[in-house]
Amino acid sequence: MNVKGKVILSMLVVSTVIVVFWEYIHSPEGSLFWINPSRNPEVGGSSIQKGWWLPRWFNNGYHEEDGDINEEKEQRNEDESKLKLSDWFNPFKRPEVVTMTKWKAPVVWEGTYNRAVLDNYYAKQKITVGLTVFAVGRYIEHYLEEFLTSANKHFMVGHPVIFYIMVDDVSRMPLIELGPLRSFKVFKIKPEKRWQDISMMRMKTIGEHIVAHIQHEVDFLFCMDVDQVFQDKFGVETLGESVAQLQAWWYKADPNDFTYERRKESAAYIPFGEGDFYYHAAIFGGTPTQVLNITQECFKGILKDKKNDIEAQWHDESHLNKYFLLNKPTKILSPEYCWDYHIGLPADIKLVKMSWQTKEYNVVRNNV
C-alpha cells in the first residue's frame, strides 16, 4: 500500500473512533470512565465517591437518581419487614388483666399473642437466644439438672439457644443431652460466703460475660434463677429490647404495698407514691446491650450501698426494681411465666410456662 493509501486509511480509522466515541458518551450507557481519584481533589477520600464521580458528571445525575430510587425501595422493604405490635399482639383478648402499660409496653399473657407469626418472623431473622443461669454450692445438686432438662424441652423451641452456666465446681455439672440447635458453655465462678453476695455479684458477672463474648454470640439474652422449672413453651413472644417479669405474689397489689426499698440511704430507694409494678429478679432479659446496661446500673447501686454500709431489702431485686422504674421495660411478662403454685391457681393464670421450685433454704444456703 502506498503512502497516500495509508494516510486515507488512518483518517478513516480515526474518524470511526471519533464517531463511535461521540455516540457512546451521549448514550445512557456511556458512563464507564475511570479517572484516577488523586487527580480530582473535589471527590474527597471516599472510596464510594471515587468510583462514581465521573460517570455521574457525564450523565447529569442519572446514576444518583437511580441510587436514590433503589435506596427508597430498600427502605420501604425494610419498613414492610418490621414486625408491628398489632401483627402478633391483641391486648383485648384478656380484658380481665392489665395487658398494656401506661407507656404502651405489652404485658404478655396467654391468649394475647400469635406465636406462629413471631416464630416465622424470627426464623427469617435467624436469631440466637442466650440464657444465663447460676448454680453455686448445693444449688447444683438440688436444682440445676431439672432446670436445664426442662429448658432444653421448652425454652425457645425451634430457635438456636446457648445456655451459659455459671458454677463454682465444674466437676459437679450434670450430664444433659441437649436437643437440636442447643449448646451450652460452662464457666467457673468464685464462690461467695453469703448467698446474698452470690445473688448480687451475678450482676457483675453477667455484665463481664456480655462484654467478653455474649454480645457477639446472641441476639437476645435472658437471665434466670436456677430454682425454677419450665412447664410449657417459653417462646419468642417473650423477646424484646428490655424485658421484665411480674412477681407472682404482687401482680394484683397496690404499689404502696410493694416491698420496694424504702430507706432513702439506699441507691434502690423508691418512695411511697411511686412505682408501676413489682418485678421479679428471677427472670429478666432483652438485647445484650440492654441487659448489659441493666446489670451495670444495678451493680453500681449495689456498690454504692456497700460503700454506705447498707444492703437493700431484697438485694439485687430491689436494685432491679429501681432500674425499671427509671428505665421502663419495653415488654413485661405475666406471672404465668414465673408462677408459684403455693398461691394456688387463680382464673387469670391460664397456662403456667415456668414455676418456682420448693425453696429449701435450710438445705441449699450456708446462711439463712
From Swiss-Prot:
Residue spans, topological domain Cytoplasmic: 1-6
Keywords noted in UniProt: Glycoprotein, Glycosyltransferase, Golgi apparatus, Manganese, Membrane, Metal-binding, Signal-anchor, Transferase, Transmembrane, Transmembrane helix
UniProt xrefs under InterPro entries: Glyco_trans_6 (IPR005076), Nucleotide-diphossugar_trans (IPR029044)
Pfam families attached to this UniProt entry: Glyco_transf_6
Keyword Manganese applies: yes
Membrane topology: Single-pass type II membrane protein
Transmembrane segment boundaries: 7-22
Membrane topology, Lumenal segments: 23-368
Chain sites annotated for binding Mn(2+): 225, 227
Cofactor(s) of this protein: Mn(2+)
Catalytic activity: a beta-D-galactosyl-(1->4)-N-acetyl-beta-D-glucosaminyl derivative + UDP-alpha-D-galactose = an alpha-D-galactosyl-(1->3)-beta-D-galactosyl-(1->4)-N-acetyl-beta-D-glucosaminyl derivative + UDP + H(+)
Active-site residue list: 317 (nucleophile)
Glycan-modified residues: 293
Cofactor note text: Binds 1 Mn(2+) ion per subunit.
GO cellular component: Golgi apparatus; Golgi cisterna; Golgi cisterna membrane; vesicle
Annotated localization: Golgi apparatus, Golgi stack membrane
Cited SUPFAM superfamilies: Nucleotide-diphospho-sugar transferases
GO molecular function: glycosyltransferase activity; metal ion binding; N-acetyllactosaminide 3-alpha-galactosyltransferase activity
Function, as annotated: Synthesizes the galactose-alpha(1,3)-galactose group by catalyzing the transfer of a galactose residue, with an alpha-1,3 linkage, on terminal lactosaminide (Gal-beta-1,4-GlcNAc-R) disaccharide borne by a glycoprotein or a glycolipid. Preferentially glycosylates proteins, can synthesize galactose-alpha(1,3)-galactose on glycoproteins but cannot synthesize the glycolipid called isoglobotrihexosylceramide or isogloboside 3 (iGb3).
Family label: Belongs to the glycosyltransferase 6 family.
This protein's name: N-acetyllactosaminide alpha-1,3-galactosyltransferase
Organism: Bos taurus
GN (gene name): GGTA1
